[in-house]
Amino acid sequence: MKPTVICHMMSSVDGRLHPERYTQPFYSVDDKFYLNSYFQIGSRLKAQAILIGRTTYQGHFSPKTYDQTGGTPVSEFSPFKAGCPSGHYSIVLDAKGKIMHEASEPWGTSAMVILGEGVTEEYLVHLRTVGVSYLFAGKDGRDMKKAFETLHDVFGIERILLEGGATVNGIFLKAGLIDELSLTVYPGIDGLKGVPTIFEYEGMEDERPADGQRLELLSATIEEGGLVWLRYRFHHAIDNK
C-alpha cells in the first residue's frame, strides 16, 4: 500500500510560488498572516508527514552540503528508523545525499531522507548519528512507488502533504501519485514570465505529465484576508478500469 498524497501549496492568483514577489494585499493583515494561514490549513488535513525537495529543505533548514568524495559505496539498502517524538515527519528527497544535517527536528518534526543507492556508508553513519531516518528509492532515488510502500509499511505513514517545490510536484504529477490538491490562493499577483508555478515537470515538449488525470472539486472556501482554499480530488485513468 501507499500513503494518501495531498499536494498542499500556496500560490498567487496567477499560480506563482514565490511569496516575496506577490503584490501587497488589499487587506490589513500581519506580514506573516498568509504563510501562517497556509500552515494552519495544512494542519486541518491531518497528515503525518510533509514531503519537500532538497532545495526547499536547504533553503529553510540545513543549508550546508555534505562531501561524499572518496566514500565507501553502500552495500545494504535497509531503511533506518530513528525516533519520532513528535509523531510527525519532514521528509526530504535527497537522492545523492547532498544535505549535511545539523539537527534532526526541523519545524518541530522528525527529519527523514529518501535516498538513491549511490550514497556512501559514511553518509548513512552521518544520518544515524544526527538521528535522521532514511530509506531508499531505487538506484537513482526516483522510484517513488517503492519509497511510498516503505513509508507505509515500515514507518506507518498513511497521509502525506507534498509541499513542493514546483519540480518535485511535477515529478509526482507525472508519476500519477497525487491523490488530492489543496491549493491556498493568495489575493495578489506576480505577473512575471518564468517564475515557478505549482507543477513544473522537466520533460520533452510533446510530453503531457497530467494525461489521464481529472480533477473533482471537493470544496472552495473563502478564508480570512481574502485567501481562497480550493480542494480537488485526482481521478486517474486507471481508477476507471
PLM feature spans:
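Enzymes that bind and transform nitrogen-containing heteroaromatic metabolites
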Residues: 1-241
